[in-house]
């Protein structure tokens, strides 16, 4: 507990220091005018400080609980974290350089140690003399797809976490070329993107399990027809002689109603898996934004298959249980069918800068679900406060019913 208390004091000091600097900066900006603020800068950067505390309650009925707490039984845990994300950009007449990273300090009541991690999420160079065309080289996050909580066409990037789809993701080292030829017959705009992504022990080695060496080539064709965006994706894996493809679309049916979808085919040795997504975004007259998505993945387990996995873990057989546990932990998407619903209300009761939201993530196969309630308040510039509550629920041998976390 001593490291956790020390970290608490450190977070408070950081918060007070950051608050003082922000207030002084705001006071000075009220009566200052700098011409340089309106001229293009060679170097620009922005950062923020996030201090978060969490209280967790563990699900002692979960079949995973004995593996996590074999000797010391725990029912609750308190976590503290400090995050400092940084974005930086250098501009020259002929090129640009981008850096995106994050430094994090975390501590937990379950451990006597404080962890420090630094992640370089993006770092790439861009040749700017070819505008509107582009050549980029370095660590890049492509952000393919139109989905919010899921991204089936993320063929050359790390998948989103549907429980926190807005979380920062780490990019991959690659070379990318973008060609924008202009409008073609019947199309308002179009573009062609070519990607080369190498996989070696020291380059993108953690991209996929059991992948030591590979050369992956990617192609993206984009077009705009009226108010509808279309994208076609194609990837070729040289060593595995595998070709994957997919497409997506997004269409504004009206000023407050949008529909989007994705489809991808992923070939794995002798198997072919498909992933699909269909979703909408709708803004009501009373400022409620609805985001609804349905997701299907044939590589996921059926209800019977997942039930068998949980029963095997529960059996406690040293070899079989550990094998099943490893297989479960390696899958971000466990089952085949999910639904995602989020409702966000802007400034209810005329409460300025206050936005509550409610999210429901459900496993349609086993009827278990995860509910996240968030309250966001940003009363002044550069300050934001968030309070959230997460509750997982489900029967025995279901994804969220057997989750180690009960609520947070």
Positions of PLM-derived features:
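Transmembrane beta-strands of outer-membrane beta-barrel pores
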Residues: 51-59, 90-94, 103-107, 141-143, ...
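Residues on the lipid-exposed face of transmembrane beta-strands in outer-membrane beta-barrel proteins
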Residues: 82-90, 122-127, 175-179, 219-223, ...
């Amino acid at each position: 507990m001593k490291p956790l208390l020390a970290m608490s004091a450190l977070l408070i000091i950081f918060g007070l220091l950051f608050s003082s600097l922000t207030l002084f900066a705001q006071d000075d900006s009220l009566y200052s005018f700098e011409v340089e603020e309106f001229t293009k800068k060679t170097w620009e950067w922005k950062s923020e400080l996030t201090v978060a505390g969490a209280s967790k309650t563990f699900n002692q009925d979960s079949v995973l609980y004995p593996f996590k707490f074999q000797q010391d039984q725990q029912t609750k845990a308190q976590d503290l974290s400090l995050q400092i994300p940084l974005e930086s950009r250098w501009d020259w007449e002929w090129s640009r350089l981008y850096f995106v990273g994050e430094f994090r300090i975390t501590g937990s009541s379950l451990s006597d140690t404080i962890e420090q991690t630094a992640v370089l999420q993006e770092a790439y160079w861009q040749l700017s003399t070819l505008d509107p065309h582009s050549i980029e080289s370095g660590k890049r996050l492509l952000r393919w797809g139109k989905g919010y909580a899921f991204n089936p066409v993320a063929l050359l990037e790390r998948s989103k976490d549907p429980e926190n789809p807005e979380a920062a993701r780490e990019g991959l080292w690659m070379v990318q070329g973008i060609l924008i030829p202009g409008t073609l017959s019947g199309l308002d705009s179009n573009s062609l993107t070519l990607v080369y992504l190498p996989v070696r022990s020291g380059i993108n080695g953690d991209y996929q399990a059991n992948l030591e060496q590979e050369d992956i080539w990617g192609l993206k064709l984009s077009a705009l027809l009226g108010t509808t965006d279309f994208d076609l994706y194609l990837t070729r894996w040289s060593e595995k002689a595998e070709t994957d493809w997919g497409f997506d679309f997004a269409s504004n049916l009206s000023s407050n109603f949008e529909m989007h979808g994705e489809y991808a085919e992923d070939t794995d040795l002798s198997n072919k898996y498909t992933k699909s997504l269909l979703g909408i975004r709708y803004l009501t007259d009373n400022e409620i934004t609805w985001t609804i998505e349905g997701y299907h993945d044939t590589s996921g387990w059926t209800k019977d298959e997942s039930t068998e996995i949980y029963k095997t873990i529960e059996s406690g057989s040293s070899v079989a249980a550990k094998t099943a546990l490893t297989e479960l932990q390696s899958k971000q998407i466990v089952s085949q069918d999910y639904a995602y619903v989020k409702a966000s209300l802007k400034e209810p009761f005329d409460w300025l800068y206050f936005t509550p939201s409610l999210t429901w993530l459900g496993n349609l196969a086993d009827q278990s679900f995860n509910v996240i309630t968030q309250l966001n308040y940003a009363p002044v510039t550069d300050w934001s406060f968030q309070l959230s509550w997460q509750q997982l629920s489900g029967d025995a041998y279901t994804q969220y019913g057997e989750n180690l976390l009960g609520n947070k």
